Amino acid sequence: MAFKDNAVELEERVVAINRVTKVVKGGRRLRFAALVVVGDRNGRVGFGTGKAQEVPEAIRKAVEAAKKNMVEVPMVGTTIPHEVRSEFGGAKVLLKPAVEGAGVAAGGAVRAVIELAGVADITSKSLGSNTPINIVRATVEGLKQLKRAEEVAALRGISVSDLA
């Protein structure tokens, strides 16, 4: 789901910049690919990729793509509602809620997504491939799977107190 209101100030973080080449008859064509995560630190986060001949232009394109690719992250206090595992390509990510004050125990690309989503207390583990784009996609996929207790109760047709 895309969010159209640009009134909210979004923070952006460049996760990776790669130099990519296309081999043509006359030699190599050099371009830059950027992976950027944007978020409002209040439950909304997105990522995007951009490619251009100059790094700043690639980053600008990635930011525009990220703004069109925002997801809502349900939170319980400063953490996530429940444990979740997700995969994308060869990358596997495990996200676990943590007690208040524990901080963000996550590395690299996962940390960027989690911090910009506004989650203050979480534990994560990246397994399998450590390619930044696949790690980011797996993390966002995991955040999409999260559901609050009220949503689960409504889906099952029972009250929240019966959810034990």
Curated annotation (Swiss-Prot):
<dbReference type="GO" id="GO:0015935">
    <property type="term" value="C:small ribosomal subunit"/>
</dbReference>
<dbReference type="InterPro" id="IPR005712">
    <property type="entry name" value="Ribosomal_uS5_bac-type"/>
</dbReference>
<dbReference type="Pfam" id="PF03719">
    <property type="entry name" value="Ribosomal_S5_C"/>
</dbReference>
<comment type="subunit">
    <text>Part of the 30S ribosomal subunit. Contacts proteins S4 and S8.</text>
</comment>
<dbReference type="GO" id="GO:0019843">
    <property type="term" value="F:rRNA binding"/>
</dbReference>
<dbReference type="GO" id="GO:0006412">
    <property type="term" value="P:translation"/>
</dbReference>
<keyword id="KW-0699">rRNA-binding</keyword>
<keyword id="KW-0687">Ribonucleoprotein</keyword>
<dbReference type="InterPro" id="IPR018192">
    <property type="entry name" value="Ribosomal_uS5_N_CS"/>
</dbReference>
<protein>
    <recommendedName>
        <fullName>Small ribosomal subunit protein uS5</fullName>
    </recommendedName>
</protein>
<keyword id="KW-0689">Ribosomal protein</keyword>
<keyword id="KW-0694">RNA-binding</keyword>
<dbReference type="InterPro" id="IPR013810">
    <property type="entry name" value="Ribosomal_uS5_N"/>
</dbReference>
<comment type="function">
    <text>Located at the back of the 30S subunit body where it stabilizes the conformation of the head with respect to the body.</text>
</comment>
<dbReference type="InterPro" id="IPR014721">
    <property type="entry name" value="Ribsml_uS5_D2-typ_fold_subgr"/>
</dbReference>
<dbReference type="GO" id="GO:0003735">
    <property type="term" value="F:structural constituent of ribosome"/>
</dbReference>
<feature type="domain" description="S5 DRBM">
    <location>
        <begin position="10"/>
        <end position="73"/>
    </location>
</feature>
<dbReference type="InterPro" id="IPR020568">
    <property type="entry name" value="Ribosomal_Su5_D2-typ_SF"/>
</dbReference>
<dbReference type="InterPro" id="IPR000851">
    <property type="entry name" value="Ribosomal_uS5"/>
</dbReference>
<comment type="similarity">
    <text>Belongs to the universal ribosomal protein uS5 family.</text>
</comment>
<dbReference type="Pfam" id="PF00333">
    <property type="entry name" value="Ribosomal_S5"/>
</dbReference>
<comment type="function">
    <text>With S4 and S12 plays an important role in translational accuracy.</text>
</comment>
<dbReference type="InterPro" id="IPR005324">
    <property type="entry name" value="Ribosomal_uS5_C"/>
</dbReference>
